[in-house]
Amino acid sequence: MIRFGVDFGGTKIEAAALDAEGRFQARVRGPSPPDYDAGLEAVRELIAEAERQAGAKAARVGIGGPGSPSPASGLMRNANSTQLNARPFPADLERVLGRPVRYANDANCLALSEATDGAGAGFGVVFAVILGTGVGGGIAVNGRPLLGRNAVAGEWGHTPLPWPAAEEWPGPACWCGRRGCLEQWVSGPAFARDAGKAAEAAAAEDGPALARYVDRLGRGLAVIVDILDPDVIVLGGGMSNVDALYDRLPAGIAPHVFSEAFDTPVLKARHGDSSGVRGAAWLWPPEPPP
């Protein structure tokens, strides 16, 4: 029983085939072309190579990537890979691949992967966070992604930093056209900008920049707890590798939660940067063996 998935990222595209136990039967990567049509062709070539490695044909493909298609028009919106916006990306992928495609936001793929057999396995409601070049959130409920009526559930990175201090208002300009989005405060580049040095070096120093980061991330996640109250929060993306977050974030979240108690686990994604392609593969039921 084989599933095929693609993680369409800003710098790389990865295609993979997984067996029923979630083990890789094929895995291949290539750079992300900046051109729309070249991106479609890159996905076609990577799926063909994954099929060759797995010795199986993909009857359908799950795709995870930035943004999401509008339920009203089918056109992409909210993608930081801006060449996708206002284009019928899922439909064009179906045309190029010649088979059905399911597309989901990459944060929803993270949530699905981790809820299935990762750090969120066994929890009913999983809120998964990407803290990388960009910032996003995804929700899985009872092992299935929650998209919402407008297919924007979990778009946490483009909500404002809660309870901003005077020096944080109105906040840095965001590519989406607003100011003060959480992405501009808790992404990897935002942390590096605030620290005045590379994110890894600043995290290793464990100084004021990291304290500010934990405070801002805690405020942002407290709003999620008040609205969704997930059973677990799973962190992915480059900043999830900062080990100090897991000791400090609960204390950064708790004062802002509208409750006298807060005990939600904050865990690191088990599958790391494989979660995107794994979650994309899990978007479809398994395919029978050839």
Describe the predicted segments one by one.
Residues 27-29, 79, 148:
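Residue-level detector of high-confidence beta-strand sites
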Residues 7, 62-66, 104, 128-134, ...:
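Short beta-strand segments
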Residues 24, 76, 145-146:
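Hydrophobic "anchor" residues
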Residues 74-86:
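A charged helix-plus-loop insertion that forms the helical arch/lid used to bind
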Residues 31-34, 60, 84, 148, ...:
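A short acidic/small-residue loop/turn micro-motif
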Residues 1-61, 70-73, 90-101, 114-123, ...:
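ATP-binding/phosphotransfer module of carbohydrate and carboxylate kinases, centering on a glycine-rich
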Residues 123-182:
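Glycine-rich phosphate-binding loop of actin/hexokinase-like ATP-binding domains
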Residues 103-107, 111:
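Short loop/edge segments at beta-strand edges and connector loops
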